[in-house]
């Protein structure tokens, strides 16, 4: 372990929101956030590394996320699933060069954001010639959030059931499930209102989705139901207000590495309805602090149909529709079960908030990251 530095350090970091969840919210060091060059916009095959714009200022350390920074400055790097990000290129010289950087002296730490991502990393590099070097640098640290000092508003179970779905990638994150749930509730006479915040990105190259545009032609019309309110986007403070007044937050996702909206919702006492995939089962416990819906996953915890070569076929579309139906039916059954047991529902909200306070508090993360910066540079 390196000796810790005692002076304030100059840290260079990216600007995007995943880094915000995986960094100190407040630091005794001087952190400069700058946009990096998005190499994936040039070619998706080279998204595994990044370059920060040239600057005359010298930095002690780069705190990167997902993409390995080019240059001479030492770096720490966090990651959400695969590192290096070089999908299907694991046998290439390019992948070996990126891995060599992780094993080299510039890399001062590799931080997985979940057991899910740590597991994938170890599997990816199990046969690497430098496995020992990179495993020695590997550790796990969950994302963090500044937990709002708000009392539980505990919406009345006798009024309309209020659910919230937030996700730009509409189909991937489970927006179709939310729409179908609203339809099933109305058909069953259950008074349910679902607020959807989504830019409605779906299909195309999104790796979980049916690829053909024709598949989605009816979904926009189905958002016009009387028990659905749709916003293309909202400021974050308004989303937080929605969480506080909701009975559940929906994330019946087909592909999420972590699900940051899940910790934002539960920080506001709102339990989750989510799928058992990615890192979600690490902090959502079924019938304890939320509802977990089963999804067929592989050994890594990813949906077995992710990145299917058949996404543009009618067969894939039928399978996707069947999964939407199954998840929506199960969600409705589970939610209605809590209507008849208010004490059990209140316990769910209490445990949801307690989980966030225990696992994701920013105060603990601030100290962790500041100490890691000092150890990396010292």
Annotated model-derived regions:
Residues 271-274, 284, 291-292:
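Short hydrophobic beta-strand element within catalytic cores of glycosyltransferases
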Residues 254:
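Aromatic "clamp/platform" in nucleotide-sugar-dependent glycosyltransferases that forms part
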Residues 53, 91-112, 219-221:
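Membrane-proximal helix-turn-helix segments that form the acceptor-binding/catalytic region
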Residues 104-137, 147:
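A short, active-site helix/loop in glycosyltransferases that binds the activated sugar's phosphate group
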Residues 233, 241-246:
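Short alpha-helical donor nucleotide-sugar binding micro-motif in glycosyltransferases
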Residues 44-45, 317-374:
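A charged, aromatic-enriched C-terminal amphipathic alpha-helix characteristic of glycosyltransferases
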Residues 111, 149, 153-186, 194-195, ...:
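Conserved donor-binding/catalytic core segment of Leloir-type glycosyltransferases
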Residues 198-200, 207-234:
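Nucleotide-activated donor-binding/catalytic signature segment of Leloir-type glycosyltransferases, i.e.
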């Amino acid at each position: 372990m390196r000796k810790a530095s005692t002076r304030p350090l100059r840290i260079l970091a990216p600007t995007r929101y995943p880094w915000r969840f995986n960094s100190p919210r407040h630091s005794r060091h001087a952190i400069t956030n700058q946009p990096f060059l998005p190499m994936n916009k040039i070619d998706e095959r080279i998204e595994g590394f990044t370059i920060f714009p040239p600057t005359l200022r010298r930095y002690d350390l780069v705190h990167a996320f997902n993409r390995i920074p080019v240059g001479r400055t030492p770096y720490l790097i966090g990651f959400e699933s695969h590192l290096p990000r070089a999908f299907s290129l694991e046998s290439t010289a390019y992948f070996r060069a990126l891995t060599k950087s992780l094993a080299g002296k510039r890399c001062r730490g590799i931080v997985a954001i979940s057991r899910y991502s740590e597991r994938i990393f170890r599997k990816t590099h199990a046969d690497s010639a430098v496995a020992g070097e990179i495993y020695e640098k590997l550790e796990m640290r969950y994302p963090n959030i500044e937990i709002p000092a708000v009392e539980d508003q505990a919406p009345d179970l006798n009024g309309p059931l209020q659910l919230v779905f937030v996700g730009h990638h509409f189909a991937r994150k489970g927006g179709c499930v939310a729409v179908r749930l609203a339809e099933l509730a109305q058909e069953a006479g259950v008074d349910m209102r679902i607020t959807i915040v989504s830019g409605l990105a779906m299909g195309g190259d999104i790796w979980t989705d049916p690829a053909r545009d024709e598949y989605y032609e009816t979904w926009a019309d189905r958002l016009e139901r009387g028990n659905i309110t749709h916003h293309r986007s909202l400021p974050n403070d308004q989303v937080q207000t929605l969480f506080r007044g909701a009975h559940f937050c929906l994330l019946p996702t087909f592909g999420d590495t972590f699900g940051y909206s899940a910790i934002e919702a539960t920080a506001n006492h709102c339990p989750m309805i989510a799928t058992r995939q990615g890192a979600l089962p690490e902090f959502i416990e079924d019938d304890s602090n939320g509802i977990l819906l089963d999804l067929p996953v592989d050994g890594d915890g990813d949906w077995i149909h992710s990145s299917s070569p058949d996404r543009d076929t009618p067969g894939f579309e039928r399978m996707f529709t069947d999964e939407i139906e199954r998840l929506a039916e199960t969600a409705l059954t589970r939610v209605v079960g809590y209507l008849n047991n208010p004490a059990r529902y209140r316990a769910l909200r209490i445990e949801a908030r307690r989980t966030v306070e225990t696992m994701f508090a920013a105060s603990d993360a601030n100290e962790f990251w500041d100490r890691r910066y000092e150890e990396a540079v010292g």
